[in-house]
Structures are given as C-alpha cells and as structure tokens.
C-alpha cells in the first residue's frame, strides 16, 4: 500500500519504506531491549535482511505496514503492522512495536491502534 498517511493527535502514521531503515531501527530488533513478542526479532538481523523484509511488504495490498512518527519532530519511534488483511471479512492480525524506549508507556499504542484500525475499517 502506497501514499498512506494517517494523522493522530501526536503522530503521523506513514507507509514504512526501506529508506527509513537504519542502525537505530536495527537496534530496536537486535538490542538488549528488544521485545520477546516480536517474532521477527527472535534472531539477530542485518540491515540488509530488515530492508528486504520491509521491501517485500511495500507493494502488498494485504499488508499495511506503517511507521509511527512524532508529529512535532518527525522522529520515527515505532511501527504498526496489519498482516494479512482480509478486506472481505474485515479481519486483520495486528502487531505493534514501540522501538523508542522513551515513548513506551505513554499511550502510543492506544492512539495509533485506534486511528489505524478506523482507517482500515473505512477502506
């Protein structure tokens, strides 16, 4: 899915693209604070592997993979992904990663899940 921007009070949700993937993002997956609940981060990943993973999802209409960006600063703090999306039955599996530790516990998930799920419901 291309050219999607969903606005919330504090965040912009934009389609995740390979140009966003850098060392900071890689640290979220490989670092000591990684989530044990993110299947993709079970093993150490290289920047190339992560970019390939993101690229493989960029043009797939059954996947909505969004970066979470702070509106005021543009800082990328995490991701939310719906995969696969069943538009006919209005069903999707959702996963979220708040990679920036400073933003954990501050209601990010609530805000972005509400806005992105409403957007998806209306699509």
What are these regions, as identified by a protein language model?
Residues 45-102:
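Acetyl-CoA-dependent GNAT
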Residues 105-119:
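Conserved acetyl-CoA-binding loop-helix of GNAT-fold acetyltransferases
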Residues 123:
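Long, contiguous binding/interaction regions
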Residues 1-51:
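A short, well-structured alpha-helix characteristic of acyl/acetyltransferase catalytic modules
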Residues 15-26, 30, 70-73, 96-109:
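Short, charged helix-to-loop "capping" segments that act as catalytic/coupling loops
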